[in-house]
Swiss-Prot record:
UniProt name for this protein: Pyridoxine 5'-phosphate synthase
Site entry: Transition state stabilizer: 172
Underlying gene: pdxJ
Family the UniProt entry places it in: Belongs to the PNP synthase family.
GO molecular function: pyridoxine 5'-phosphate synthase activity
Enzyme Commission identifier(s): 2.6.99.2
Chief subcellular location: cytoplasm
Its job: Catalyzes the complicated ring closure reaction between the two acyclic compounds 1-deoxy-D-xylulose-5-phosphate (DXP) and 3-amino-2-oxopropyl phosphate (1-amino-acetone-3-phosphate or AAP) to form pyridoxine 5'-phosphate (PNP) and inorganic phosphate.
EC supergroup of this enzyme: transferase
Keyword set, alphabetical order: Cytoplasm, Pyridoxine biosynthesis, Transferase
Amino acid sequence: MTATAQILPNTLEQNSDNISKKPLLGVNVDHVATLRQARGVSYPSPLAAALLCEKAGADGITIHLREDRRHIQDADVYEMAGQLTTRMNLEMAATTEMLEIACRVKPYWVCLVPEKRAELTTEGGLDVAGQLDLLKDYVAKLQAAGIKVSLFIDPEDKQINAAVTCGADAIELHTGSYAEAGLAGDIEKGSVELERIKTAVITAKRIDSKLLVNAGHGLTHDNVNAIAQIDGIYELNIGHALIADALFVGIEQAVIMMKIAMHR
């Protein structure tokens, strides 16, 4: 738990101004499922956690249905689709199986991400430029089913251009390198990575003013504010750090704390 977490007011009413500000906060509850799967039992429930996050002011819920089903399971996706009161953002790889699931569930958002079975977490952005034809067709099929599509990409011009060519409704900029620099205490690299993200937002809006620009990966109370202050960022998706704080303060308070950290 960070120093920030120890001094914040702890009620929704005290923080109503922060709750309603942009960028929006999407909460990833994958690691509630990670804890459940560690014992192969039926608890804790990602759905119950998601509903508490919504109650505390989360603007959306993100879940990643991986091909290896290491945390979120198919049943979680269907449960949430029927009970969330905000927007479901379903992260998934661009496979035939996942397309079929998404078209049945019809989440508000699908965010296409790269996957490697050996990785602990998503290690980088999707190479949209390198598989343009495949992804353009895939995006079109999702949109034909009434689903908005986001592409998780590195903050690079070629990937932004490719995402626009694909017809994506949004991009999510990978903030992992920025976050890792901060954890390593590398202030110079952190500044460089922050500027890359700022430039990417400007580039995206210049190419397509209607394109929504989200960001996420590795964001914590200590590093989120600089990203949240970037003009043009629509939503931040945060999971691991928020769920970690929830172990100490409860999940509703963790959501409130993250909103305050974003807008302090």
